[in-house]
């Protein structure tokens, strides 16, 4: 005699998966291209950590966002062998 017992009181319902979710992108990266003209306070680069360092006339926010301190032209430059910086140079009028 073969008995086929199924105890359904402890089975999980088959409806959703445990890993079926993803977080939205954080919109990080370059916000002002090299050579573009920006005003003071403009966001130049959004980042987590100091992927790019602040150069001349560039400030760094609490979340490591780089922003222009003066009106001028954006310039991305090398800082040594393996680092980069972004600077803003005022335009002579």
Swiss-Prot record:
Region (Disordered): 8-29
SUPFAM superfamilies assigned: Ribosomal L27 protein-like
Entries under PROSITE patterns matching the protein: RIBOSOMAL_L27
Example GO BP: translation
Annotated InterPro entries: Ribosomal_bL27, Ribosomal_bL27_CS
Removed propeptide positions: 1-8
Protein's UniProt keywords contain ATP-binding: no
GO molecular function, one term: structural constituent of ribosome
Post-translational modification: The N-terminus is cleaved by ribosomal processing cysteine protease Prp.
Keyword RNA-binding among UniProt keywords: no
Gene Ontology CC: one annotated term: cytosolic large ribosomal subunit
Keyword annotations: Ribonucleoprotein, Ribosomal protein
Similarity annotation: Belongs to the bacterial ribosomal protein bL27 family.
Name this polypeptide is given: Large ribosomal subunit protein bL27
Protein source organism: Limosilactobacillus fermentum (strain NBRC 3956 / LMG 18251) (Lactobacillus fermentum)
